[in-house]
């Protein structure tokens, strides 16, 4: 059961993947986690990735593809995986097809969490984080008991720079410009399934399970 999760920042991909990996018994793999693992392992690939990220640049496709191939070759992926944050481009989608072909597998589902720009802005721009313990709040869906203070440690809550409305709108536009063609790529191959990402978490999980278990 090989699955790709697609959707703009704030669509909830990571949240859904964490729930579904427990239900389905397959790993949740994100590009961010893969990069961090390589860096922690101090591998040659990890050193290259670390240098690129320190310069504030995007990790190029060829390097990302190698890391993805290595991760998907591990034993825990034999029964399947949920891939989150990759592919971001049509070139990466084609590379993933080749990687899976060499492993004797194929992608079964590309699940697109459709969320409007306004919903994404509302979700992300209302996010607040504790400066002390890192607990995450949302002023609308998960507000602190005392405004501006962490429920756990009493630390001050702050808004990340890239969570500001104007930045979120820019990130949404970048996603739609660069990654939306991937959605069309999977639509043409009849692997795309669209889920309303503005629903509550339980409803989204139920819908994804309905798609997978049809």
UniProtKB/Swiss-Prot annotation:
Catalysed reactions listed for this entry: AMP + ATP = 2 ADP
User: Which residues are in coiled coils?
Assistant: none
Region spans: NMP: 30-59
Localization annotation: Cytoplasm
Enzyme class label:
transferase
Residues annotated as binding Zn(2+) are 130, 133, 150, 153
Q: What is this protein called?
A: Adenylate kinase
Species annotation: Thermosipho melanesiensis (strain DSM 12029 / CIP 104789 / BI429)
């Amino acid at each position: 059961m090989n699955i790709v999760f697609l959707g703009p920042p704030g669509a909830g991909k990571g949240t859904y993947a964490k729930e579904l990996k427990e239900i389905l018994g397959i790993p949740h793999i994100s590009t961010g986690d893969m990069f961090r693992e390589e860096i922690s392992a101090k591998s040659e690939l990890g050193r290259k990735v670390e240098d690129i990220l320190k310069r504030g640049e995007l990790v190029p496709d060829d390097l990302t593809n190698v890391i993805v191939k290595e991760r998907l070759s591990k034993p825990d992926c034999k029964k399947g995986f949920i891939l989150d944050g990759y592919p971001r481009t049509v070139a990466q989608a084609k590379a993933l097809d080749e990687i899976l072909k060499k492993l004797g597998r194929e992608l079964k589902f590309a699940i697109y969490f459709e969320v409007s720009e306004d919903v994404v802005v509302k979700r992300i721009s209302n996010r607040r984080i504790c400066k002390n313990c890192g607990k995450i709040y949302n002023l609308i869906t998960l507000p602190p008991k005392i405004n501006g203070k962490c429920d756990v440690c009493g630390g001050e809550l702050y808004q990340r720079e890239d969570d500001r409305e104007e930045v979120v709108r820019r990130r949404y536009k970048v996603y739609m410009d660069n990654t939306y063609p991937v959605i069309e790529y999977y639509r043409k191959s009849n692997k795309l399934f669209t889920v309303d990402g503005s629903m509550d978490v339980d409803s989204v999980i139920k819908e994804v399970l309905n798609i997978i278990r049809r």
